[in-house]
Regions:
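N-terminal Rossmann NAD(P)H-binding glycine-rich loop of SDR-like oxidoreductase domains
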Residues: 78, 86
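Catalytic loop of short-chain dehydrogenase/reductase
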Residues: 179-204, 209-218, 230
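Conserved NAD(P)H cofactor-binding loop of Rossmann-fold oxidoreductase domains
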Residues: 134-140
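Substrate-binding pocket helix/loop in short-chain dehydrogenase/reductase
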Residues: 142-143, 150-152
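A short, exposed helix-loop element centered on a Lys and neighboring polar residues
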Residues: 166-167, 210
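C-terminal helical subdomain
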Residues: 218, 225, 241-280
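Conserved alpha/beta core of the MobA/IspD/sugar-nucleotide pyrophosphorylase nucleotidyltransferase superfamily
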Residues: 1-64
Length: 280
């Protein structure tokens, strides 16, 4: 029909199949119509750049119901976000075990240390329900001037450590139907000068989270990743010095929202945590 033009499927149906009923359903602003191969490519790029919605904040009663009697393991739990997550979980009745270099002499980048922690916690509590890894190091400097030792030490902590944690704790999380939480940085979307090691490792963590969510789906183990905006932690202060408090998230706020993610039914999601208002 060379004289017929239409910009949508409904017009075609009305013209050639007038006896067929057409229903109208409510859509969503995030719906995307895929009709051409390029649409699939665009959709994939949007998925890569779009953070998932944060889960609904839990009430005190819900925190207690989901944490009381459960075992939570936190790597990097001596201070900062990890320390605050541990404190919150403990307040709601969880059996919390924290591990770090400074408090327990645990090197999360060493598989033997991670395996030892898993067995120790299992012996002490009989189960492992939640695992959080907040351990990380922030190395600054031009890559061309970075020593091989620094490259290995940074990559070991920021990337290999989460892999070892995932491998060693997966069997225990599969038994409990548990959840693992990792952390990335806003630099994962685009590498930054002077942060090549850090930002590339954080991009890898995002990919690792998504891959593990697929691999673990049939085992009932969830894994998500939190991407907090600039947060007031000892690691950041050491790297950048004192900054105006109003420009940073508090580690307590990040910890509570991270706990919501850890306890949610989500898996494979990258959750942005941002300040609601305040100076840029």
């Amino acid at each position: 029909d060379p004289n017929f033009t239409a910009t949508d499927d409904c017009t075609v149906v009305l013209r050639y199949l007038p006896e067929v009923s057409i229903a109208v359903v409510s859509g969503h602003e995030r719906n995307m119509k895929v009709t051409e191969p390029i649409d699939v490519y665009i959709a994939d790029k949007l998925f890569q750049l779009t953070s998932a919605d944060r889960p609904t904040p839990l009430t005190n009663e819900q925190y207690s119901a989901r944490l009381d009697g459960r075992t939570v393991v936190v790597f990097g739990g001596s201070y900062g976000i990890g320390g605050d997550i541990a404190e919150l979980a403990r307040a709601y009745g969880a059996n919390v075990r924290t591990f770090s270099r400074s408090t327990t002499g645990t090197y999360v980048e060493k598989r033997a240390d991670v395996a030892k922690v898993a067995q120790q916690v299992l012996d002490e509590t009989g189960r492992i329900d939640f695992v959080v890894n907040t351990a990380g190091v922030l190395v600054r400097g031009e890559l061309a001037e970075t020593s091989e030792e620094t490259i290995y030490s940074s990559t070991d902590v920021n990337y290999l450590a989460p892999i070892f944690v995932a491998q060693e704790f997966f069997p225990h999380l599969a038994k409990s139907g548990g959840s693992m939480l990792l952390f990335t940085s806003s630099s994962y979307t685009r590498g930054r000068s002077g942060y090549s090691l850090y930002s590339s490792a954080k991009a890898a963590i995002v990919n690792l989270t998504q891959a593990l969510a697929d691999e673990w789906a049939t085992s009932g183990v969830r894994v998500n990743c939190v991407n907090p905006e600039r947060t007031g932690t000892p690691m950041r202060t050491k790297a950048f010095g004192e900054e105006p408090p109003g420009t940073l998230l508090s580690s307590e706020d990040v910890a509570r929202q991270s706990l919501d993610v850890l306890l949610s039914h989500l898996t494979g999601h990258i959750i942005d945590i941002r300040r609601e208002e305040g100076p840029a």
